[in-house]
Amino acid sequence: MLSFFTGRSGRQEYWISVGLLIVAAFVLSALHMEAASAAITIMWVITWMRRLHDIGRPGWVALLPIALMFIAIMIGLTLGGQPFLAAIAALESMNTNIAISDRIAYLIIGVGLVAVICQFGFTIWLGVKKGDQGSNRFGPPPEQIIKRD
């Protein structure tokens, strides 16, 4: 397992991994397997780490988007997210007697949206940034998965 955290991923391998992770996340969500989200998160971190290695950056930087999302969740809960989550649960169970402040709801959604936009931007940046030519401190350059003649 630890070998997944080492080495480099080129842009081609990165985008294939991103596509597979998105499909896996949708499939697991459709199957109501939310518990598998931790595994998907770990795979995102591994994908980001290997791509960061290709551009000469340390892998720990991949933890920043996850930390940002965690902070956004904590801010949301601190600002009244518990009633917000209770209201969502009530709506799912068709109990519409629980009301929350619109301002709190918009604030929580806004904080989460900022975190998601940052993760999206980070993912795109890693996918378009050129990797280091030749070997770097993380190993030799990655080979292309699909060879072009």
Residues covered by each model-derived region:
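Membrane-interface extramembranous regions at the lipid-water interface
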Residues: 1-25, 40-60, 122-149
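Central hydrophobic cores of alpha-helical transmembrane segments
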Residues: 17, 61-70
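Membrane-helix interface segments in multi-pass membrane proteins
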Residues: 24-41, 68-119
